Amino acid sequence: MKLIVGLGNPGREYAATRHNAGAWWVVRLADQLGVTLKADGKFHGLCARIGQGESESWLLNPQTYMNASGRAVAALCRFYRIQPEQMLVVHDELDLPPGVSRLKLDGGLGGHNGLKDIVAHLGTREFWRLRIGIGHPGEKHAVVNYVLQPPRKEEAALIDTAINDSLEVWPLIAEGNYQAAMMRLHTQKQS
């Protein structure tokens, strides 16, 4: 894995919202790895390098708004010649309940504007996704307000569990052992 992207919106007013679950995950991974995400205007985001040489990878939290995430992702991919299939995009997922996370390659976009913009910039859906469940408000018209609100206390605890569970399989993802990562993540007892 050469690039790990955490989707979210920049700014304090969005920091605690459900839509930032992907960004939360990347911040936690950076902490776990002992690196600091730093602003990089060239890549329109907060970045950190992990590893060196052949094992070099990048963490990126775009600081564009969600709907323009592809600009940041494409800039870093072009500069470091990273292929889409070498990338993991971590994002909030309405179709999974809080407490559940799932890893997959390719697939639909589920109406997620951050994913849509990445696909528009890269011209492919062939990249890995780590989907962090945030639940669904029940009504389609309520989705925008729902994702831009902080989770309730009990939901926040479940989302935190999903982030912890998926961080436990990070070493498998990092070494390219995706099947083992999926097996472990998808069969863990999820709350």
UniProtKB/Swiss-Prot annotation:
What taxonomic classification does the UniProt entry list for its organism? Bacteria, Pseudomonadati, Pseudomonadota, Betaproteobacteria, Nitrosomonadales
* E.C. numbers: 3.1.1.29
Q: Which GO terms describe its molecular function?
A: peptidyl-tRNA hydrolase activity; tRNA binding
Q: Which reaction does it catalyse?
A: an N-acyl-L-alpha-aminoacyl-tRNA + H2O = an N-acyl-L-amino acid + a tRNA + H(+)
- Source superkingdom: Bacteria
Active-site positions on this chain: H19
Identify the residue position(s) of the site Stabilizes the basic form of H active site to accept a proton.
D92
Identify which top EC class this enzyme belongs to: hydrolase
- A Pfam family for this UniProt protein? Pept_tRNA_hydro
Task: State the family it belongs to.
Answer: Belongs to the PTH family.
In its UniProt record, which GO terms are filed under biological process? protein quality control for misfolded or incompletely synthesized proteins; rescue of stalled ribosome
Specify which residues bind tRNA according to the UniProt entry for this protein. Answer: Y14, Y65, N67, N113
This one is known as Peptidyl-tRNA hydrolase
What keywords are assigned to this protein? Cytoplasm, Hydrolase, RNA-binding, tRNA-binding
Q: Where in the cell is it found?
A: Cytoplasm
SUBUNIT field = Monomer.
